[in-house]
Amino acid sequence: MLLTGVNLLLRFAGTVFGVYLSRRIGEQGLGLLQLTMSVGSLAMIAGIGGIRTAAMYLTAEELGRRGRRGVNRVLSGCLGYSLVCSAAVGGLLWVFAPAIARNWIGNTGIIGALRLFSCFLPITCLCALLTGYFTGENRIGVLAAVEIGEQIFSMGVTVLCLALWAGSDPERACRSVIFGSAMGSLLTLSLLGLLYRRERNPVDASIPIGRRILRAALPLAIADTCKGGLSTLENLMVPKRLALATADPLGAFGRVTGMVFPVLMFPACILFGLSELLIPELARCHCGGGEKRIAYLLHRSLKLSLLYGVCFGGLLFLGGNALCLRLYSNPEAGNLLRLFAPLAPMLYCDAITDAMTKGLGQQHMAVRFNILTNILDVIGLYFLLPVWGLKGYFVSFFLTHALNFFLSLRHLLRITGQDLCAYIPLWTLTCAIASVWLCGKVPEPILSCAAFVPVFFSSLYLTGVLKGEDLRWLRRFTQAK
């Protein structure tokens, strides 16, 4: 429950902060910030170079083999790898910042923001390394407390910079956000470094570690960088191709990525916490030959994520306009949220499917599916955006995410030898459509949303889709963790 609570708190804080930014710099400023952070995200993925996951696995492995004698050796080797990788990527970002700003983003005013990001990149990557190390030691409570402190401190510094220096200037706002994030990373690095120094682990310099680090980190680095590169290419391409169909492409991009998506995916933070619990549980069952337990978890998790996604999809569809008017004073964002709301069940179920796939040791297949659908998304956006504008963005988003979900679910069912009954999804969608239609006749959005939940779940109970044992299982599963 700790991970779920932390995810919920951090996602809520991030959403509130996003609303503050949207009111401060507008949708065009949000679009520019999203493009800048997309480039920064790619640099961070390349700079981390898979070392977070490698440090986590190698630390856990050493603790299981030799106790704490080999932990120092693991961390020192990972530290050298991280410094070399992050410094190289940071140097490249500094050198090519003018070309990236001019040719990719189309705004030379953010050269300073990109170079500021490059200066603090090693600190961010070292934070990822120490996070992986403490995760390998299973010190989740420590990481949760530090992460909350980092988020609060980062947002505080950013708000201070915006209020005292940046104002509503988009370029300065980008630098303020990057500086605030860097200060949060610096705080995390300091705290985790102090905690590590207090451990006083014995040193065993005879343990060979270099090749093990490369074997663990390099495949992850290549896969993550390819995926991140495609995602960045997609984000950078959207405003350029939208410019052929709309007069304000940057504002449209900021409206979708900075306003609609945070609200659409906010309820999923609870499922993300559940997915963190599923990965180790399924891994234990897989190693211990617990096929019946795997089948039970698969059906229960997919069913509850479907019901959860359909419920919030209906709420966002009914209350999307009122919610976006309240948060952003932007009716166009409300229309877009209603357009994307029916995709919530698929997106939420996909998150659980990915977690179960990883728990069964099939991470490489998830990476393959993601890279394939990202390539198709880039192709689809290139051709559809100039013709249909944001509707083309929606079509490409829907088709590629549906394909990714289909491939992931099919692979999960194949490796577990399970089948799904069509009765539950068909009746769930039927009940949802009927409930939305009925509650949509209520003129007040708040009342229609309030009526939707009991109407929807009553219809599920009457049709036999929802049973008391489903809720009892969820309560037992989360309380046991």
Describe the role of every protein-language-model region:
Residues M1-M56, G90, W94, F120-L121, ...:
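Signature of the first transmembrane helix
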Residues L10, G18, G49-M56, L116-T135, ...:
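Short runs within selected transmembrane alpha-helices of multi-pass transporters and secretion channels
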Residues A97-L116, L315-L347:
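Interfacial segments at transmembrane-helix termini and the short loops linking adjacent helices
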Residues P170-I178, G193-K227, G289-K292, R414-T428, ...:
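Interhelical loop/hinge segments that connect adjacent transmembrane helices in multipass membrane
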Residues G440-K481:
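Membrane-proximal transmembrane or re-entrant/amphipathic helices at the cytosolic face
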